[in-house]
């Protein structure tokens, strides 16, 4: 009872309502990633690229799996004072996924098209200003210290479902860079299906699982790690930064 009372009196993290403000502007990026199973098995290698096209930025994440599967995600956004998602595309195919799926939506037209296996859907799509499909890691780097954020993502089955999201700091973890200890902030991204569909999901024990991101602290925040599902009802995967491997030098 005392613990409950203390928790009730503890101040909650200040919430950032609406789109996340730009604190660290994005630019040209090219990084390398590895995707592993929860048991640590290497499943895929990936690349993250970001390009600037006028006042729009295009963020692309591609994983090529050992079994031939493909995960190809592209988010186009602007960063005039706040981050604003303008367009999104996602392709998932191959044996690592239950079925081939393709999704695309665009704020300019206000429309979407989606395919999951043999099922297709298209039409008008509600796109809140704080929609962040493909931008979650960027938003977490820009959250003010100690603040929580909220937003939305769209899930497709293939019909669209708007999901509420809460982004908050969960804790801190130590990691090593060489022998030097560093600190990473661990963020929790909570997904919540609103309305009667959310109630039904809770009753059936099918609430969307939480996602976790690790971001290096300091004056220049940097993505370190992701852990969670990358498709509906999928396994828990881990994404981390990867270092290139060099072929053995020939003997001289």
Task: List the predicted regions and their residue ranges.
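Bacterial N-terminal signal peptides
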Residues: 1-11
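Acidic, serine/threonine-rich low-complexity disordered tracts
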Residues: 17-107, 150-252
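Serine/threonine-rich low-complexity intrinsically disordered regions
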Residues: 2, 128, 144, 193-198
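Surface-exposed beta-loop interaction hotspot
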Residues: 112-151
């Amino acid at each position: 009872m005392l613990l409950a009372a203390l928790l009730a009196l503890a101040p909650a993290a200040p919430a950032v309502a609406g789109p996340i403000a730009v604190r660290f502007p994005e630019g040209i990026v090219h990084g390398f990633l590895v995707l592993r199973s929860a048991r640590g098995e290497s499943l895929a290698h990936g690349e993250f690229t970001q390009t600037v096209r006028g006042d729009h930025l295009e963020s692309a994440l591609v994983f090529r799996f050992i079994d031939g599967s493909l995960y190809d995600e592209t988010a186009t956004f602007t960063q005039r004072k706040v981050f604003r998602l303008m367009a999104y595309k996602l392709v998932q195919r191959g044996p690592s996924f239950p079925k081939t799926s393709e999704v695309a939506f665009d704020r300019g037209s206000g429309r979407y098209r989606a395919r999951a296996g043999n099922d297709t859907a298209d039409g008008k799509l509600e796109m809140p200003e704080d929609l962040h499909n493909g931008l979650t890691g960027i938003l977490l780097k820009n959250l003010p210290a100690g603040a929580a954020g909220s937003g939305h993502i769209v899930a497709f089955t293939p019909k669209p479902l708007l999901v509420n999201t809460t982004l908050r700091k969960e804790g801190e973890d130590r990691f090593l860079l060489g022998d030097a200890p560093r600190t990473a902030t661990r963020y929790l991204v909570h997904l919540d299906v609103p309305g009667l569909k959310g109630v039904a999901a809770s009753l059936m024990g099918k609430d969307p699982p939480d996602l976790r991101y690790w971001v290096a602290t300091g004056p220049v925040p940097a993505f370190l790690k992701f852990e969670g599902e990358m498709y509906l009802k999928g396994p828990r995967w881990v994404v981390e930064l990867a270092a290139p491997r060099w072929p053995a030098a020939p003997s001289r």
